[in-house]
C-alpha cells in the first residue's frame, strides 16, 4: 500500500494507493459509524462498483444514499449538478454529510463542486476509477463544471478529505480511457521530471498491459509530483500553472469539437505537441525532444495532431477565454527541456497559429 500526504496545513489529506481498497472499510476514513453519505457515480460505473462500495460503507455503519448521473463529459454541466443538489435536499442531507465521488474526472470534478457549494461547503472524498483521475484530477482540489463557451469555467478550489485509489478499477477501464490517462502521466515527465519521462519510455508497454508494480509506481510518482506542486501553490498563482501543459490548446479542441467527442487526455496529448512546436519556433526546445514526446504519445495510442476539421484560427477564441489569460494576453505552458517548463506570456498569435498548423492532421 502506498500513502502520500498532500500537505496543506489543517486541510492536509492522504492519498491511499493499493489493490483491494474497496473491500476495506478503513479505506474510507475519516468516515465513521452513524455518519451520512451521498455516493455520486455514473450509469457506467454503478453496475460495476456501486453495490460494493455501498456495502463496505454500510459495513462500517455509515448511512448511504446514492445518485447516479449520466456518463460523459457533456454531462459535466450546471443542469446535472442540480440533480445532485436535488438528491441531497430531498433526503435531506445537512452540513454534516459527506459526498463520495466514485468515478472519473467528470464525476470527481462535479461532485467536488457540489460539495464546495452545498450549504456553503460539506466534506467530500475522491474515489477515482480512471487512470486520468487517479493521477491528476482527484488530487489538488480543482472542482468545476463546464460552460458551452469554455471548459471548467464554473468552479472552486475545494480540497477533498481523502483520495482512495483502488488499482483494481483499471481492470475495467476501456483501452481508449487508459490511453487518455497516460497523456496526463506523460505530462508530468515533460514538465517536472525528466527521469520519470525516461522511465516511461522504458516501461510504457508494462503500463499498457496493466502490470501491477509498474502501474503502482507510475500512479504514486504522479501523485507525489502533483502533491508537491499543490502544497507549494494551491490556488495556481505560479508553479501550479505548469500542470496545464497542453491544456490551453486541448481545452480549445474539447470546446470546439463538442465535449466528449475528444477525450480530455486525447486533446491534451495533441495540445502538448502544439506547445512543443510553439517552444521550438521560439528557439527554446529542440525538434529531437519534440520527437521523443510524439513517439511516446503515439506508443500510448494518443493523437499528436489536432482535428482535421478544426482550423488553426478556430483555436484562438477559446484560448483567449482560458483561465490563465491575464490582461487579455495568453499565458502558455511551454517545455524548455524534457523535465523543465515555463509559463510564457507575449507569444504572438501568428507564431501560435503557425505552431498549431504544424500539428494539423494531413
UniProtKB/Swiss-Prot annotation:
Keywords: Amino-acid biosynthesis, Aromatic amino acid biosynthesis, Cobalt, Cytoplasm, Lyase, Metal-binding, NAD, Nucleotide-binding, Zinc. It comes from Escherichia coli O157:H7. One of its GO terms (molecular function) is metal ion binding. NAD(+) binds at residues 71-76, 105-109, 129-130, 142, 151, 169-172. Belongs to the sugar phosphate cyclases superfamily. Dehydroquinate synthase family. Pathway: Metabolic intermediate biosynthesis; chorismate biosynthesis; chorismate from D-erythrose 4-phosphate and phosphoenolpyruvate: step 2/7. It is found in: Cytoplasm. Catalyzes the conversion of 3-deoxy-D-arabino-heptulosonate 7-phosphate (DAHP) to dehydroquinate (DHQ). It catalyses: 7-phospho-2-dehydro-3-deoxy-D-arabino-heptonate = 3-dehydroquinate + phosphate. This is 3-dehydroquinate synthase. It comes from the Bacteria. Its cofactor is NAD(+); Co(2+); Zn(2+). GO terms for biological process: amino acid biosynthetic process; aromatic amino acid family biosynthetic process; chorismate biosynthetic process. Binds 1 divalent metal cation per subunit. Can use either Co(2+) or Zn(2+). NCBIfam families: aroB. Pfam families: DHQ_synthase (PF01761), DHQS_C (PF24621). Its EC number is 4.2.3.4. Zn(2+) binds at residues 184, 247, 264. GO terms for cellular component: cytoplasm. The keyword S-adenosyl-L-methionine does not apply.
Amino acid at each position: 500500500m502506498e500513502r502520500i500526504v498532500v500537505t496543506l496545513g489543517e486541510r492536509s489529506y492522504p492519498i491511499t494507493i493499493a489493490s483491494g481498497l474497496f473491500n476495506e472499510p478503513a479505506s474510507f476514513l475519516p468516515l465513521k459509524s452513524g455518519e451520512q453519505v451521498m455516493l455520486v457515480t455514473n450509469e457506467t460505473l454503478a453496475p460495476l462498483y456501486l453495490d460494493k462500495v455501498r456495502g463496505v460503507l454500510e459495513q462500517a455503519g455509515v448511512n448511504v444514499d446514492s445518485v447516479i448521473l449520466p456518463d460523459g463529459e457533456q454531462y459535466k454541466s450546471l443542469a446535472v449538478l442540480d440533480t445532485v443538489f436535488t438528491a441531497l435536499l430531498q433526503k435531506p442531507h445537512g452540513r454534516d454529510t459527506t459526498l463520495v465521488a466514485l468515478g472519473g474526472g467528470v464525476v470527481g470534478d462535479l461532485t467536488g463542486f457540489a460539495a464546495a457549494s452545498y450549504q456553503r461547503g460539506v466534506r467530500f472524498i475522491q474515489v477515482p476509477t480512471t487512470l486520468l483521475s487517479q493521477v491528476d484530477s482527484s488530487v489538488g482540489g480543482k472542482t468545476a463544471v463546464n460552460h458551452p463557451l469554455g471548459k471548467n469555467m464554473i468552479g472552486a478550489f475545494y480540497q477533498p478529505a481523502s483520495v482512495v485509489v483502488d488499482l483494481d478499477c483499471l481492470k475495467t477501464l476501456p483501452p481508449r480511457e487508459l490511453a487518455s490517462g497516460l497523456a496526463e502521466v506523460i505530462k508530468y515527465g515533460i514538465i517536472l521530471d525528466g527521469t520519470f519521462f525516461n522511465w516511461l519510455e522504458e516501461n510504457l508497454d508494462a503500463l499498457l498491459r496493466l502490470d501491477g508494480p509498474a502501474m503502482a509506481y507510475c500512479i504514486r510518482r504522479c501523485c507525489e509530483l502533483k502533491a508537491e506542486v499543490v502544497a507549494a501553490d494551491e490556488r495556481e498563482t505560479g508553479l501550479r500553472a505548469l500542470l496545464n501543459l497542453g491544456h490551453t490548446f486541448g481545452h480549445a479542441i474539447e470546446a470546439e469539437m463538442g465535449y466528449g467527442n475528444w477525450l480530455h487526455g486525447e486533446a491534451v496529448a495533441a495540445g502538448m505537441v502544439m506547445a512543443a512546436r510553439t517552444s521550438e519556433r521560439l528557439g527554446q526546445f529542440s525538434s529531437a525532444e519534440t520527437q521523443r514526446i510524439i513517439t511516446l504519445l503515439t506508443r500510448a495510442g494518443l493523437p499528436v495532431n489536432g482535428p482535421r476539421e478544426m482550423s488553426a484560427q478556430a483555436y484562438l477564441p477559446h484560448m483567449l477565454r482560458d483561465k490563465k489569460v491575464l490582461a487579455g494576453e495568453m499565458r502558455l505552458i511551454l517545455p524548455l527541456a524534457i523535465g523543465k517548463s515555463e509559463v510564457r506570456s507575449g507569444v504572438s498569435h501568428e507564431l501560435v497559429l503557425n505552431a498549431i498548423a504544424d500539428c494539423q492532421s494531413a
